[in-house]
Each structure stands twice: as structure tokens, then as C-alpha cells.
Amino acid sequence: MKNESPQHFIRPSSPVDPAVVRVLRPLDPIARAADCAYFVAGATARDLILVNVHGLRPGRATRDIDFGIAVESWDQFALLKERLVATGDFASDRRALQRLIYSDQATGISIPIDLIPFRGITSADSTIEWPPSRDIVMNVAGFEEALASSVSVEMGGDLTVRVASLPGLTLLKLVAWSDRSRETNKDAADLHRLLTSYADAGNTDRLYEREMDLLQAFDFDMELAGAELLGRDVASVCSPGALDQIRSLVKSERELERLTNQMIQSSAYPEAAAAVARMVNAFCRGILKDS
């Protein structure tokens, strides 16, 4: 899954939030001029793919927009931020080194923009240490894979951007859940949404035409088949190191039980605990296939 996906288009019936487009219009050419490959991540990527491309229902609302930014040095990252601030539309946030605040002139609303750098500044343990003190450490495991497996989405006009694919986004969510699951359930809730939506997000024909074994294994339950297919696809976009990391995670009964419980707690139908557990097991089976 190395950028082989066809170009995606926004459904006229599910237009993108205009504020998102207004953020992307100045950011895209500035990132290109600074030679910074980037992709849209987080909840914005989720909604672009699930809602705006495939027409599925909106998920958990959020106003911030996340980006993964590939840079070779901290100087290159600083230059990108300086050029964005110089437009007058973005301002630095002293409380968070990765954050800019976009002032939406059309609405008067301020939108947090998180720019997560990786690549040349990433340590062997997949972390980055923010200068100058280097005492703020951030885990960027999965970002290389998310960029490599990102998909192209035409936003309208002459604007086309890279967006984290659903497998890439799921990988990032697994890493985030592993890091902060004792502080918040939101990553588990997002993972549950991805698992339950994958079949309907452009994979129905694929399941019937190329993955009939999955449909038969789950008695033609599309959600369960989609969950295992997502697990397989996540494994396919992983580097060997990332794959070892997530396979170790899903092999832990204690961690899986905690993930399942958090999904149940965040579900609109907590009484469906058994169904959630089956979906998590199907997803994990996909990740562990051929291991």
C-alpha cells in the first residue's frame, strides 16, 4: 500500500467543512515550497475519508486539524512554521511547540493546527525530542507508514492533498491508544469507528470479489469481515518494526481486554459488549495473519 490508491473525490452531497479548506489552501503550497511532504491526520483525515469521500455518518466532533510533516531537520521545520506565520493567518502557540493557531477570517473562529514533524529528526526508538531543551519527547511511531500509505484527495479547484488512509490512520490510533489509554478513551472510540466503518468505506466490492473467504468465515457479517480486512491492511502498510510493535500489543490479553472495555464504554450501545469483543478479535486476527 505505497501510494497506489486511486485519487479520491469529495461527494457533492458531503462537502468538506469550508474552514478545513481555508487552512489547507495556504498550507499546501508553503509545505511544498519548503520541500516538506505532509499528510492530513487525526479526526480530520477520518472525516475526509469516511464522511466526505464515502458519505458515511459524521463521528466525534473536533475543531483541531492534525498534520504529519516529513522534515530532515529542526531548521526545516522551523522555516515551515515561520512561513506559515508570515501569512498572517497563523500564529504560534507558546503552550504547545507543535501547534499553530489559524484565525479563520470568515467565521472569527480560531482553529488549533498541530504539525507533527518526523523523519530526519526521529530517533531509533521512533521518538522526537523538541528543541531547545529536548525534555519534551513525542512518539511518532507509524508516521512514516501513514505517509507512505496516504491517499490523494481532490478538495476542489486546484487543491489536492495527501490524507492518511484508513489503515494508516488505524496504525496511528493504535500507537496513540498504547501511549495514552490510561488518560482518555477517545482513541478507543476512534478505533471502534474505524473498525465498524471499514467495509462500507469502499471495501464492499472488494470483500465480495477478492475476499470471499472473510465473508464466509463471518457468515456474511460485513462489519466483522471488514474489521479483519482492516487488520490485514494495517499489517500490510507496516514496516517490520511497526508490525512487531502492534502484534505485540494485540497479543497481550490484558491490553486487548482494556481496549475492548474502553470501546464498550464509549459505544452508544454499551449493551453490545459481545459484539464489540467479536469485532476486536476479528481485527486482531487480521493483524496476526501470516505471523
Task: Give names to the regions the model predicted.
Residues M1-S291:
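Compositionally biased terminal segments of proteins
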